[in-house]
Amino acid sequence: MFWPIVACVLLPWLLVYLGLHVVQRGIIFIDIAMAQMAALGICVAVLFRLELESWTTFGIALAFTLAGAGIFSVTGKRTSQIPQEAVIGIAYVVAAAAAVLLLSRAAEGDEEIKNMLVGNILLVTPREVWERFALFAAVGIFHFVLRRSFLLVSFDREGAYQKGLRVRYWDFLFYAVFGLVVTSFVRIAGVLLVFSYLIVPAVCGINLAQRTVNRLLIGWFIALLGGIAGLFLSYWWDLPSGAAIVCTFGALLILISLFALWQQHRVRSVAIQD
């Protein structure tokens, strides 16, 4: 349990930050679509009997993810008759179906489909944790250096256009780096857990705070709590770790949403009395 706990402590901080960007952009399902594209690349590697932790497998998965980054940056036009969420949904469904088709030809297809969805974070190794932590730290520094442009495009898209930013270029850069992070994490965590780490803590932070810094702090706490609690639940009750963490996140989101509604009702009641 030690290294899975270390992974749940060291790795989610960047996912929460990227999740805030995704939620503010209003393209919630882009993360699960990108994760599924990375998983499709891994399925290709499985079909050709490549080592899953090899650089070749990582390169194939990253190539599929970058293809998705290119598609989503092109389709995210300022004015378009087709909503980008429709393109994202289509990409996810096609990638998921293609993955199932590929794994149907693999010797251990059923097991790989399960790993693709929920991963097996209990089997994470020290090398996998430190490699991903180093990558996430590099991406975090990259985002910090370019934070003004990234934040402007995500949080004030019209303002970015008015200031003359090449929004499509910044979109591709964001999606490409985002895809790099997703590709590295999806192998140990699975598609559903990647989606949960990206979206649920960010939504919890938005429910409880207005300032971006406070949302990040709340999101980090929720990611830490949900990950560790889910791991212990899976250990005590002999449950799949990824699915247990996802369901724990769901329970936390329900509780926080109810608390946020109660808080809003309380504020309105006080305002009416005054």
Task: State where each predicted segment sits.
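Transmembrane helix-bundle core of multi-pass membrane transporters
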Residues: 79-146, 274
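Small-residue-rich segments of transmembrane alpha-helices in multi-pass membrane proteins
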Residues: 35-45, 90-102, 123, 167-177, ...
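Transmembrane alpha-helical segments in multi-pass inner-membrane proteins
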Residues: 192-243
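Short loop segments and helix-boundary regions at transmembrane helix junctions
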Residues: 20-33, 43-109, 205-217, 234-237, ...
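Cytosolic-side transmembrane-helix boundaries in multi-pass membrane proteins
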Residues: 32, 48, 242-274
